[in-house]
Amino acid sequence: MRRRTFLGMSSGLGIVATGLTTTPALAGGRRPDLTVAVDGGGDHTGIQAAIDAAPAGATEPFVIGVRPGTYLGQVVVPATKPFLELRGLGRRPDDVVIADDRANGTLKPDGTPWGTSGSASVTVSGADFRAVNLTFANLFDEAAHPEITNRQAVAVLTRADRLVFDRVRFLANQDTLYVNSSAAGVVARVHLRDCYVEGDVDFIFGRATAVFDRCRIHSLNRGSTPNGYVTAPSTDITNPYGLLFQRSRFTSDAPAGTVLLGRPWHPGNDPNAIGQTIVRESWIGAHIPDAAWSDFGAWPWEDARFFEYRNAGPGAIVSANRPQLTAEQAGEYTAAAFLRGSDDWTPERC
């Protein structure tokens, strides 16, 4: 898709999903410490410049307010800068767009490819990061680059712990949202509430512990069968908590029965990556078939930790192909349990 079409089509979908048409960005928040404005009316004109100007080693939030506009270029939040907040100052999440357009196979100046992680429009390595009321996008145009076969194009890559995304849109095609950690066996928690995530192949993936609460998960129609896979978790075997979707909506423009809920990703054929995806108390559209889970190469989905609980909608089918949590298990696999950790983190109170 062309960039303008991509953003225009997606913006309406995200707003309908979250109902965020009239929520002022400043309500209930502290005043920004720095302001970014593409027209030069703020402290900086670019997102990265503002992040570079933020203090290192902070112990309380440092707020960067972003005025409406489209901000192009890769953004990196380094591990040395915890407690950063990017806050969109528009009335809707699509008023502020932070985007880049490279893919896995896009070549660097030295002739080597960027790779999947290197393709990310935004990389978050700083703990206690927060993003509010804005859009992250990877605008890589697959149709315009048939010469590139490795088309993974990440909008956001997370590697840190205790991250919050509130009323945020994530837009791309393959590999939109990469929720990861700094290393295998290291737990990194992410809380996403009232968000919108759009893509086609494995577009929510990684080994982080991530809770999606009241989110809309939208699968694009890429004109194939299967049309894609929503999740590709690579949860470490030592981590009891992977990807949790609760009170969310799974939607698509794709034909009925052509999108899978997920498949187990084993990076580098790691046998200890026993992915977990749980979908509970959510609405699932007809694009999800009876056999909702898929093998990933030689790795069978039955060996992963895939479960559902009390879902509704035409795609919420209870069968032998759709493992369900028991009531007792459902009491254990809650958002609070996923996010609590050893430090009793409660982001819903933030």
Mark where each language-model region is.
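N-terminal export signals
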Residues: 5-25
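Sequence-level preference for short, compositionally simple segments enriched
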Residues: 30-350
